[in-house]
Amino acid sequence: MQAPRELAVGIDLGTTYSCVGVFQQGRVEILANDQGNRTTPSYVAFTDTERLVGDAAKSQAALNPHNTVFDAKRLIGRKFADTTVQSDMKHWPFRVVSEGGKPKVRVCYRGEDKTFYPEEISSMVLSKMKETAEAYLGQPVKHAVITVPAYFNDSQRQATKDAGAIAGLNVLRIINEPTAAAIAYGLDRRGAGERNVLIFDLGGGTFDVSVLSIDAGVFEVKATAGDTHLGGEDFDNRLVNHFMEEFRRKHGKDLSGNKRALRRLRTACERAKRTLSSSTQATLEIDSLFEGVDFYTSITRARFEELCSDLFRSTLEPVEKALRDAKLDKAQIHDVVLVGGSTRIPKVQKLLQDFFNGKELNKSINPDEAVAYGAAVQAAVLMGDKCEKVQDLLLLDVAPLSLGLETAGGVMTTLIQRNATIPTKQTQTFTTYSDNQPGVFIQVYEGERAMTKDNNLLGRFELSGIPPAPRGVPQIEVTFDIDANGILSVTATDRSTGKANKITITNDKGRLSKEEVERMVHEAEQYKAEDEAQRDRVAAKNSLEAHVFHVKGSLQEESLRDKIPEEDRRKMQDKCREVLAWLEHNQLAEKEEYEHQKRELEQICRPIFSRLYGGPGVPGGSSCGTQARQGDPSTGPIIEEVD
């Protein structure tokens, strides 16, 4: 029997929700997780006993706010001192600490203090998506295309790639979210001739605008713009602040210091925001929000729009910039395509429609799933899928920011202009600034400003051993090379000696080293093993409980009441009571202890039931063993809630 063909998946790793898709038999399928949901919250929670990822983590966030981590995408590839990180920390209930200038989240897991890099948290979400795909496909998944906001810089892309590696994935390609959405939009519109499309992607935490031309399977990005720190969560924050102020006004109490109350309020605000996309008013009802005070209030759509008006309006600036860079007039755009959950907000749609002079917006693709859909198609292309639908699909993306180096006087000398099609390679020759200079210090920047101090330093390296010569004589050739992932490497070569030095940009040592990634891969496997052990433990506990209640139930049955001798009945009842009392005090026992208790109970019950039935049977025609196995997750669902 031949092995199943290896499949690659497309993963939309979102700020608030993630989504996974696969392309097979000529079509994309978006895969539902173990809760039946096609999107999974990008949440990871740590408790005294286990680690939770996705829906399970988000649903217990109010009970465990300090150890429930979300928004890793707003930390990934950034420095701790970054102003956005500092302002976000005010809203997060979990702690963020600095380690070597990099942010790490600090949580309490199994009674110990632990710190995790954002890449590790994101890798846990990616592992969950990988497991979702494996459960659906029935085979291991090793390869993936992962999406990032178009405006993510080099270090954020590198860090996302590292997160994939920690999750045990071979990241085939990092692609831009709006480009992936454009594939989802354009795949079934092959015969329509060349069309200029503007993708407006407003998600939970990031905002991108991309202008593309789509023609016969060629998707060419003309320009991209955006804000890596604008999305639905910022609208939630405005609502939270509004209601916190209202609570203080009405009840004279400040709940800003209570993480649990804030989490409950935030959840209610998120729900109200969604309601306001379809209704003009939303009601919040939170029992005993803070110090026993119930909070019942409402908000109108108009008030919500006023609270967020500056944020909504700010989405138009990147639209104008992308059109300018693409050298297109708004009248030349054939389709304006909405992507991301926040584009459901009526005011956002109205502002955009008015900007395009009343043009009808295109809502034909699912805003929550389009990015994963496009990523799945690109994954199939990179795996060499022969389906005619994707065979001649070509993706031409761009570098979102200009790249260059610092020359004398702190001037930014650009080698790669923003919106240059990638992959790309540019070479320029530089020379020394002073006589007999033994080396050159090359500092690489990204950004659009004339002076490097106003741009973002990506990395620095030295080319030494230049033979003594007057200034201006040595020739140093510098090459900037961007690969298809949008990741940059820079080489400097001294022409006279042929000596070279190279750097793959690491955002001022912000990137994880190979050893660190390997260590995290090992730790991820360890956490997975711990999670499985916890699942087995819970299954053994449920199995024991089910068995006890089955025995107790059998003793109550009319048909058996008179057949069991009083002494045997008492023996079984006493044992059941003993096991239940033991369970009460041993909620966190090991799997083996539960199994031992179950065996002891079986040793008492089996001979009695055997005598009764003249064989190994128990009531209902099932043996003790099968009855007990009902708690086993492999034979059926457990419907018992486990705290």
From Swiss-Prot:
| Record region (Substrate-binding domain (SBD)) | 396-511
Entry's Gene Ontology molecular function annotations: ATP binding; ATP hydrolysis activity; ATP-dependent protein folding chaperone; enzyme binding; heat shock protein binding; protein folding chaperone; unfolded protein binding
Which InterPro entries has this protein been placed in?
A: ATPase_NBD, Heat_shock_70_CS, HSP70_C_sf, HSP70_peptide-bd_sf, Hsp_70_fam
Q: Where does ATP bind?
A: 14-17, 73, 204-206, 270-277, 341-344
Which Gene Ontology cellular-component terms appear in the entry?
Answer: blood microparticle; centriole; cytoplasm; cytosol; extracellular exosome; extracellular region; ficolin-1-rich granule lumen; nucleus
Where is the region Disordered? 616-643
What inducers act on this gene?
Only at higher temperatures, and no basal expression.
* Annotated stretches, region: Nucleotide-binding domain (NBD): 3-388
GO biological process assignments: cellular response to heat; chaperone cofactor-dependent protein refolding; protein refolding; response to unfolded protein
Under the heading Pfam families, the entry gives: HSP70
Query: What keywords would UniProt list here?
Result: ATP-binding, Methylation, Nucleotide-binding, Stress response
State the Gene3D superfamilies in the record.
1.20.1270.10, 3.30.30.30, 3.30.420.40, Actin, Chain A, domain 4 (3.90.640.10), Substrate Binding Domain Of DNAk, Chain A, domain 1 (2.60.34.10)
- Residues carrying N6,N6,N6-trimethyllysine: K563
Its domain comment says:
The N-terminal nucleotide binding domain (NBD) (also known as the ATPase domain) is responsible for binding and hydrolyzing ATP. The C-terminal substrate-binding domain (SBD) (also known as peptide-binding domain) binds to the client/substrate proteins. The two domains are allosterically coupled so that, when ATP is bound to the NBD, the SBD binds relatively weakly to clients. When ADP is bound in the NBD, a conformational change enhances the affinity of the SBD for client proteins.
User: This chain belongs to which protein, by name?
Assistant: Heat shock 70 kDa protein 6
Task: Give the encoding gene's name.
Answer: HSPA6
